[in-house]
């Protein structure tokens, strides 16, 4: 077991809880909880030496599994060998990435059969929003990777529509770059009372002017185009480790843009690219179609285009409940979120859908929600209970039939409670 970087604060507790390897963010290696403090704990009899031996065995097993060395059985020694190089960005890898992105897209809302768009009849398409032309694989902190390429939503749409459709793109909203303050939040978290900060949006007069101009441009074009897609959401100024969002509101004045564009063209499809929920109350009821795309990786733009154009039937389900507002979340309701950096998690296990169900709190979209372009019928549900002195089993089975006119996938979800 390996720790997160800078996450270990107590030596004995970490040693007794199964931690094998501590990672941190400072250069004072001897001061790490699992370094000299652990040695002293063993010498003082607070941690058993056998526990340390077990941790070493776990680390050596991993190194051996990764071919970092081989073992000379006769001499009982480790032998350094040349590690086998792997491969990356192969056609098979790209296909897996594309398929994963396809299956992750969630169709949240689709009134009047607004989606999919009819590709053959599409001659002009307006795409609005910075996230349409932005890539996100650089992650939000230590999630950063060096992707060899990434297909943006705009690029994916242009590729799949080819030369038969004119695709017009406008930014819609102004996204100013945040200035880093140089604080090492991971190192800061190791200090007493340290932790994450909060990210709040502030706009000056120049930003407000630019946003007004871009909003007016988006509204003007939205009234001229029959088919409009707004691609917004969050980015890694907000979806990032090391600091919390102050609320769930869309940044960069996007709510005002979406409202105005929907007023100009009620058929506008709204796509959210984000890794965490956002408030949708100002415009969700006005939108006929809402799609959630996540940060879908290198092939995310192609996958999104395939779903919007009906080449792929969406089958994704939400892995979490989307509240209407951050004030509906348990951490806020018990007063455990605010300016303080030290939190006590008084909500206990009642987080996410557990809290919403226990307190009967309505949500924007529930855990497991996700629509399809086709319809499925469930029948012949059977429930079998098996119980003995040691264990208790419940076997649930049913037959699922596609009753629509499109090929599709359906994920069967079973919910249980005591």
Q: Would you name each region that the model predicts?
A:
Residues 1, 10, 254-258, 268, ...:
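Extended, hydrophobic alpha-helical segments in both membrane/secreted and soluble proteins
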Residues 1-29:
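Short acidic/histidine-rich active-site segments
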Residues 12, 30, 40-41, 45-141, ...:
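Secreted, periplasmic, or luminal enzymes acting at the cell surface/secretory milieu
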Residues 136-139, 232-251:
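Glycine/threonine-rich flexible loop motifs
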Residues 158, 258-265:
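Surface-exposed amphipathic alpha-helices with a cationic face
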Residues 218-221, 283:
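Structural alpha-helical scaffold elements that stabilize or flank donor/cofactor-binding regions
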Residues 225:
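An anion/phosphate-binding loop that grips the pyrophosphate of nucleotide cofactors and donors
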């Amino acid at each position: 077991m390996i720790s997160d970087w800078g996450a270990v604060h107590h030596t004995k507790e970490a040693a007794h809880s199964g931690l094998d390897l501590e990672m941190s963010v400072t250069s004072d290696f001897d001061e790490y909880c699992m370094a000299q403090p652990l040695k002293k704990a063993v010498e003082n009899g607070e941690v058993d030496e056998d526990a340390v031996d077990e941790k070493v065995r776990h680390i050596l097993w991993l190194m051996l599994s990764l071919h970092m060395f081989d073992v000379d059985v006769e001499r009982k020694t480790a032998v350094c060998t040349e590690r086998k190089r792997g491969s990356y960005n192969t056609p098979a890898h790209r296909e897996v990435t594309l398929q994963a992105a396809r299956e992750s897209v969630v169709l949240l809302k689709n009134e009047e059969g607004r989606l999919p768009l009819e590709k053959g009849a599409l001659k002009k398409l307006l795409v609005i929003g910075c996230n349409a032309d932005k890539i996100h694989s650089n992650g939000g902190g230590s999630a950063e990777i060096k992707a060899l390429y990434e297909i943006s939503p705009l690029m994916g749409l242009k590729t799949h529509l080819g030369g038969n459709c004119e695709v017009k793109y406008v930014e819609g909203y102004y996204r100013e770059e945040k200035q880093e303050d140089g604080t090492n939040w991971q190192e800061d978290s190791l200090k007493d009372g340290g932790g994450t900060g909060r990210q709040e949006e502030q706009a000056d007069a120049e930003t407000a002017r630019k946003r007004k101009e871009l909003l007016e441009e988006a509204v003007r074009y939205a009234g001229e185009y029959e088919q409009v897609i707004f691609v917004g959401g969050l980015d890694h100024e907000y979806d990032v480790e090391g600091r919390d969002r102050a609320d769930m509101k869309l940044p960069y004045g996007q709510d005002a843009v979406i409202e105005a564009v929907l007023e100009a063209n009620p058929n506008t499809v709204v796509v959210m690219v984000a890794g965490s929920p956002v408030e949708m109350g100002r415009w969700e009821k006005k939108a006929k179609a809402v799609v959630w795309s996540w940060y879908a990786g290198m092939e995310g733009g192609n996958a999104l285009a395939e779903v919007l154009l009906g080449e792929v039937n969406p089958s994704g389900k939400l892995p979490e409940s989307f509240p209407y507002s951050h004030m509906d979340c348990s951490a806020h309701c018990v007063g455990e979120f605010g300016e303080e950096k030290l939190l006590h998690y008084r909500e206990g296990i009642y987080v996410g859908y557990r809290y919403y169900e226990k307190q009967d709190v309505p949500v924007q979209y529930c855990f497991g929600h996700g629509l399809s372009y086709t319809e499925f019928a469930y029948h012949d549900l059977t429930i079998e209970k098996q119980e003995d002195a040691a264990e208790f089993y419940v076997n649930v089975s049913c037959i699922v039939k596609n009753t629509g006119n499109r090929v599709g996938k359906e994920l069967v979800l079973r919910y249980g409670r005591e």
